[in-house]
Amino acid sequence: MEKISLITGATGHIGYALLKELVDSGEKVRILIRKDVPVFDGIDCEKVYGDVTDSESLDKAFEGVDVVYHLAGVIDINPGVEDLTWRVNVNGTKNVVRACQRCNVRRLVYASSVDAFPPLPDNQVMTELDHFSPKNLDGTYAKTKAIATQFVLDNVHEGNIDAVVVHPGACIGPYDFKVSNVGEMVRMFIKGSFPVSLSFGAYNFVDVRDVAKGMHAAAEKGKAG
C-alpha cells in the first residue's frame, strides 16, 4: 500500500511550502482543509475537509496515513483572538495527537515555534529544552505553543506516540499567499514604511523552503522528541 502523508495547515506559509516539497519528492499527500482555495489547483494532492478543533473529522482524515505534519495554528497576536488561539493551538494539537493514536499513525511531525522558548540573558546561546512551560512567556501565542509542545513531548515520553517537534523561526520566501505577519513586515521594510532596528540581540529569518525540507527530513530521520 502506498504511504500517505497528511498536512494540517496547508494553506499557511510553511504548510504550502511543505506540500510542494512532499509532492515534488513523489509522495502521496493528503491535506486537511476547512474549505477549498484556488492555490491548490494543479497540485496533485487529496483534499479532505475538517478542522483540528473537531476531533471526529480527524478520524476520517487520518485513516491510512503514515505521517501527519501538524502545522495548523493561529499566529495572530492582535487582541480579541485569545480564545480562538487557545482552541486551535492547544486543543487542536491535543485532538491531533489523540487522533494519531486512534488511527495508528506511524509518526507525527509537530511544528512548534521558537516563541515557545523563554527569553534568555544577554549573550546566552539558545539550546534545546527538555521541558516547555508558559511561565515567563509573553503573549497568548507563545504560551499556547509552549503548552502544546509539552503535551506532544509528554505523549512521546509516555510511549503513546512517535513524534518529532520542530521549532521554526521567522519564515520568509515564496508561497506567502495570505501574507504572514513576517511577510508583511518585510514588505513594509522594503517600501521604507517600516524602519527596523534592534537595540540588542538579533532576529532569526529562515527560508520557508529550508523549513519544509527540514520537516521532511524530520519525518524520515528525526529522533523522537
Model-assigned labels for residue ranges:
Residues V186-V196, A202-G225:
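Alpha-helical substrate-binding/gating segment
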Residues C45-N91, A99-R102:
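NAD(P)H-binding glycine-rich loop region in Rossmannoid oxidoreductase-like domains
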Residues N91-Y141:
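Conserved Rossmann-fold NAD(P)-dependent oxidoreductase catalytic core, especially the SDR/UDP-sugar
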Residues L137-V164:
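Active-site Tyr-X1-5-Lys
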Residues G159-I161, G173-E184, A217-G225:
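Glycine/proline-rich active-site loop of Rossmann-fold NAD(P)-dependent oxidoreductases
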Residues I4-S25:
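N-terminal Rossmann NAD(P)H-binding glycine-rich loop of SDR-like oxidoreductase domains
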Residues D138-G139, G169-K178, S197-R209:
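Glycine-rich "substrate-gating" loop/helix at the edge of Rossmann-like oxidoreductase active sites
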Residues I77, V114-Q124, C171-Y175, S180:
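Conserved catalytic-site region of short-chain dehydrogenase/reductase
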